[in-house]
Amino acid sequence: MPLNVSFASRNYDLDYDSVQPYFYCDEEENFYHQQQQSELQPPAPSEDIWKKFELLPTPPLSPSRRSGLCSPSYVAAFASFSPRDDDDGGGGSFSSADQLEMVTELLGGDMVNQSFICDPDDETFIKNIIIQDCMWSGFSAAAKLVSEKLASYQAARKDGGSRSPARGHSACSTSSLYLQDLSAAASECIDPSVVFPYPLNDSSSPKPCASPDSTAFSPSSDSLLSSAASSPRASPEPLVLHEETPPTTSSDSEEEQEDEEEIDVVSVEKRQPPAKRSESGSPSAGSHSKPPHSPLVLKRCHVSTHQHNYAAPPSTRKDYPPTKRAKLDSGRVLKQISNNRKCASPRSSDTEENDKRRTHNVLERQRRNELKRSFFALRDQIPELENNEKAPKVVILKKATAYILAIQAEEQKLISEKDLLRKRREQLKHKLEQLRNSCA
């Protein structure tokens, strides 16, 4: 049966409304072509409102970067999906228009992120990741679309069986003509060394960045293209999904956006299995002049965008500035260090505390005994409480105060009497002297 490129009818215009706008300024577009063909239900009122006001799409879209599709791995992948001849038992062949439709379906337009199916050796792979608008959450849906297309193509390829090298070479040449026009956008890419001073991939040996004009087709890519077209074994392994990391789905990305406020991005890493290395090191691999083609492994990584949800209520949690937070952390560390120093010798500290408590108890007992004896002595000096052994301390203090005041008053009275008596004595002495002088 011939290779069927068409998929189930899905309204991708509604699924990818963040990527494709509903209308263009000063241009009449058929926005509801599926509705006119199948006479489905009328469009949503939101779409009529957008069409009524004819607003420009915001935010603006980024320029399309399709130079990554010209990599040898992608050309080899397309060569593996080439149609069969009538004599191979396939049931028919495709014309040039069908091949063009296949390429258009495989490319997927702006709905497919080109960083999924490009070769990591190509310099435009890094540029695609840098320039692609990841804030509109188009990666998860694009990854799902690519996985569905590749699964259908691989199923059709397995049903088709083996293909002739001549037919694969013609398909590669045709696809290279279609893909060569896409390399013009590579000159408009930004050099990743300007944006990221450090390398983005985990390769041990850094590779010098090539000029944007030379990233479309290099001599190494031409040799890989010719070898991929001539060798029938190079076609079945252009793109391999890692077993530990399943392809990203839209539900997974939505959950991770709600929990971690991060967007999933699929990065391509080049890995060579040990079986391939053993085959390349064996002498039987001398017949093949090219090195074994390394599979592409899709892995998931997280790119933090730090998006702010303006619709959410203001948080009541107080965020400290970095300097104040550093001071608080340093204070906590110092407090922990002081506590550790205090608890360095627990036995010695316990003995010291027991000794201090014992001496304190002894001194407190002595103080209480002295105070009790003082109250007893004061009670004995008061005539009213002299024989009252159960007199409280308050009564002792009050009676002692009254007794002291009475004694002070009596003292003042006695002092005044003493002064009068002294004066009387002086007068009597003076009178005695006068009498002695008169008698003489």
From Swiss-Prot:
Efficient DNA binding requires dimerization with another bHLH protein. Binds DNA as a heterodimer with MAX. Interacts with TAF1C and SPAG9. Interacts with PARP10. Interacts with KDM5A and KDM5B. Interacts (when phosphorylated at Thr-58 and Ser-62) with FBXW7. Interacts with PIM2. Interacts with RIOX1. The heterodimer MYC:MAX interacts with ABI1; the interaction may enhance MYC:MAX transcriptional activity. Interacts with TRIM6. Interacts with NPM1; the binary complex is recruited to the promoter of MYC target genes and enhances their transcription. Interacts with NUP205. GO terms for cellular component: cytoplasm; nucleolus; nucleoplasm. Residues 202-362 are annotated as: Disordered. Pfam families: HLH, Myc-LZ, Myc_N. Phosphorylated by PRKDC. Phosphorylation at Ser-330 by PIM2 leads to the stabilization of MYC. Phosphorylation at Ser-62 by CDK2 prevents Ras-induced senescence. Phosphorylated at Ser-62 by DYRK2; this primes the protein for subsequent phosphorylation by GSK3B at Thr-58. Phosphorylation at Thr-58 and Ser-62 by GSK3 is required for ubiquitination and degradation by the proteasome. Dephosphorylation at multiple sites by the PNUTS-PP1 complex promotes MYC stability by preventing ubiquitination by the SCF(FBXW7) complex. SMART domains: HLH (SM00353). Keywords: Acetylation, Activator, Chromosome, Cytoplasm, DNA-binding, Glycoprotein, Isopeptide bond, Nucleus, Phosphoprotein, Proto-oncogene, Transcription, Transcription regulation, Ubl conjugation. It is found in: Nucleus, Nucleoplasm; Nucleus, Nucleolus; Nucleus; Cytoplasm. One of its GO terms (molecular function) is protein-containing complex binding. The modification N6-acetyllysine is found at K144, K149, K158, K276, K318, K324, K372. Residues 355-407 form the bHLH domain. Residues 267-279, 316-332 have a biased composition (Basic and acidic residues). The gene is MYC. There is a cross-link at K52, K144, K149, K299 (Glycyl lysine isopeptide (Lys-Gly) (interchain with G-Cter in SUMO2)). Residues 414-435 are annotated as: Leucine-zipper. One of its GO terms (biological process) is G1/S transition of mitotic cell cycle. Residues 252-264 have a biased composition (Acidic residues). Transcription factor that binds DNA in a non-specific manner, yet also specifically recognizes the core sequence 5'-CAC[GA]TG-3'. Activates the transcription of growth-related genes. Binds to the VEGFA promoter, promoting VEGFA production and subsequent sprouting angiogenesis. Regulator of somatic reprogramming, controls self-renewal of embryonic stem cells. Functions with TAF6L to activate target gene expression through RNA polymerase II pause release. A motif (9aaTAD) lies at residues 101-109. This is Myc proto-oncogene protein. A motif (UBR5-degron) lies at residues 356-365. Residues 336-348 have a biased composition (Polar residues). Glycans are attached at T58. The modification Phosphoserine is found at S6, S62, S71, S82, S152, S162, S294, S315, S330, S345, S348, S349. It comes from Pteropus hypomelanus (Island flying fox). Residues 210-239, 280-289 have a biased composition (Low complexity). The modification Phosphothreonine is found at T58, T316.
